[in-house]
């Protein structure tokens, strides 16, 4: 999954570095 602030699930599964 890609980092997406609009999608909590995708956002959580993203690497911590990409969460920013």
UniProtKB/Swiss-Prot annotation:
One of its GO terms (molecular function) is toxin activity. Expressed by the venom gland. The keyword Secreted applies. The keyword Secreted applies. Its main location: secreted. It comes from the Eukaryota. It is found in: Secreted; Target cell membrane. Keywords: Membrane, Secreted, Target cell membrane, Target membrane, Toxin. One of its GO terms (cellular component) is membrane. Monomer. Homodimerizes during storage at 30 degrees Celsius (observed after 3 days). This three-finger cytotoxin shows cytotoxicity and direct nephrotoxicity. The cytotoxicity has been observed on B16F10 melanoma cells (EC(50)=2.56 uM) and on kidney proximal tubular epithelium LLCPK1 cells (EC(50)=4.79 uM); it is due to necrotic cell death and not to apoptosis. Direct nephrotoxicity has been deduced from binding to LLCPK1 cell line and to kidney membranes. In addition, after intravenous injection into mice tail vein, the toxin principally accumulates in kidney, but only minimally in blood, liver and brain. Belongs to the three-finger toxin family. Short-chain subfamily. Type IA cytotoxin sub-subfamily. This is 7.2 kDa cytotoxin RVV-7. It comes from Daboia russelii (Russel's viper).
């Amino acid at each position: 999954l890609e980092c997406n602030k609009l999608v909590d699930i995708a956002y959580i599964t993203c690497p911590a570095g990409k969460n920013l």
